[in-house]
Structures are given as structure tokens and as C-alpha cells.
Design a protein with these regions (language model features):
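Oxyanion-hole/transition-state-stabilizing segment in secreted/luminal serine hydrolases
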Residues: 84-120, 140-143
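Active-site segments of SGNH/GDSL-like serine hydrolases
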Residues: 107-108, 126-154
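Active-site-proximal beta-strand/loop segments in catalytic clefts of secreted hydrolases
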Residues: 38-42, 79-84, 104-108, 138-143, ...
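Stable alpha-helical elements in mature extracytoplasmic
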Residues: 56, 60, 85, 89, ...
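Catalytic His-Asp segment of secreted/periplasmic serine-dependent ester chemistry enzymes
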Residues: 143-227
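Loop/turn elements at helix/coil->beta-strand transitions in domains of secreted/extracellular proteins
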Residues: 31-34, 71-75, 97-101, 107, ...
Length: 227
């Protein structure tokens, strides 16, 4: 277990702490859908400075906007760190507001044997911290050495999101083979997406943020987020 838990941290991930070009800066005169994040190494991708606007090269956050088109999504805050469990996110995430809150959590919880019930309680706590009309809960990527647990957890997330009135997106679908492992070439360690995998994950999350969320924002203006 200790070896596996270590793998879920920063092992095999880029160490670059480069700023995302649009991080925490929404260009004037352009309509953007803003989002905050709560996550682990799949979001941080080696960075320890996500809270101040830095993610690694293999973070999905970099790839939510369609290449070659005007950016419509702006990342404006949140927290993520390699090895983080959902409870860590609920403690470390700071209050804020955005059009959407994207939560991608649970890989490390599964490694530590946390129950779905415990994780669900932490996810609800996370959602209460950020004022966002849209809570977008994403599936977690495959884990090649824990296929059954990952499949069951993603099913739990889908059901949980529906019960809370959140939006669920199976953003990891494009990473998954028929055997529910990583498609070859999309991960270097069977746990974390590499850059090519992050592009697929980010595109799926970006699509979810630019379709359903905008209608949800219009429908729920002034409504407190569910928690």
C-alpha cells in the first residue's frame, strides 16, 4: 500500500510549476465562463502552487479551451495537490465564487480504502465552500491496478451527482479501453494521464463547462449551490 500511495502523489508527473496563461486573469471585454477546481495530482500535475495559479504541463486545466478558437473558459481559483484525498481538499480549499466548481477527486481515497459514504460527505463539504451555480463532478481516470474499484467508484459519483442536483461528466471516458484500463499512450504509469491524456480529459471537461453549465447558470441565478 505504501508504494502505491506514493505513486498516487507526484511520482512520474512533470515538476514544472509553470503558470497557466489565463490563470486567475479574465481578459476584459470578453465573456468567459469561470471555474474553480478541487483535485489531486491529476489536476495539479506536479505543481504545489495550484492555489496561486500554477499547474503542471499534464494538467487537464490547460486544455479546457479548444485550440485555435477564442478562449471561453477561465480558471479563477481552487486547490489541488498530489496525494490529496477528498478530505484534504475539503480542508484546504478556500472560499470563492465562480460560474462552476469542477471536482475531480477520489483516486487517493480509493488507495487509502476510504468508503464511498465518507468520500461523498467530503465532496458535499467541498461544494459548500465555493459559491457556484454549477458543480461539475468528473469521473476519475482509470487505475490499471484497481480496475473494479475505479469502475464502481465512478458509478457512485454518477449517482451521487444526480442525488445532489450536480452535473456529472464522464470526462475520463476517452482515456479508457474496453478493459477499463488506460488506452495505450495516454498514461506513463497507469494512474495519471500524461500530456496526451490530459488533453482528452481537459477537452471533455471543457465541453461540459460550455454546454450544460451555461444553461444551468441561467436557470439558477442567485440560487445557493447544493451542498
Amino acid at each position: 500500500m505504501a508504494v502505491f500511495v506514493g505513486l498516487l502523489g507526484l511520482s512520474g508527473m512533470p515538476r514544472a510549476d509553470e503558470p497557466l496563461p489565463q490563470a486567475f486573469a479574465v481578459p476584459a471585454g470578453v465573456n468567459h465562463n469561470t471555474f474553480m477546481v478541487a483535485g489531486d495530482s491529476i489536476t495539479a500535475a506536479g505543481s504545489r502552487k495550484v492555489a496561486v495559479g500554477h499547474v503542471g504541463e499534464a494538467s487537464w486545466v490547460r486544455y479546457v479551451n479548444t485550440p485555435g478558437t477564442p478562449a471561453t473558459l477561465a480558471w479563477t481559483g481552487g486547490w489541488a495537490l498530489g496525494g490529496a484525498q477528498s478530505g484534504d481538499m475539503a480542508v484546504a480549499l478556500r472560499a470563492g465564487s465562480a460560474d462552476s466548481l469542477v471536482i475531480l477527486a477520489g483516486t487517493n481515497d480509493l488507495a487509502h480504502g476510504n468508503s464511498h459514504t465518507m468520500i461523498g460527505e467530503n465532496l458535499a463539504r467541498i461544494a459548500r465552500i465555493v459559491r457556484a451555480p454549477m458543480v461539475l463532478l468528473s469521473s476519475i481516470p482509470p487505475r490499471d491496478d484497481a480496475v473494479a474499484a475505479t469502475v464502481a467508484y465512478n458509478e457512485f459519483l454518477k449517482t451521487f451527482a444526480g442525488e445532489r442536483g450536480w452535473t456529472y461528466v464522464d470526462a475520463s471516458a476517452g482515456l479508457r479501453s474496453e478493459a477499463n484500463t488506460f488506452i495505450e499512450g495516454l498514461s506513463d504509469d497507469g494512474v495519471h494521464p500524461n500530456v496526451e491524456g490530459a488533453k482528452i480529459l481537459g477537452a471533455a471537461i471543457g465541453q461540459a463547462l460550455t454546454t450544460k453549465p451555461m444553461q444551468a447558470i441561467a436557470d439558477t441565478a442567485g440560487v445557493e449551490p447544493l451542498g
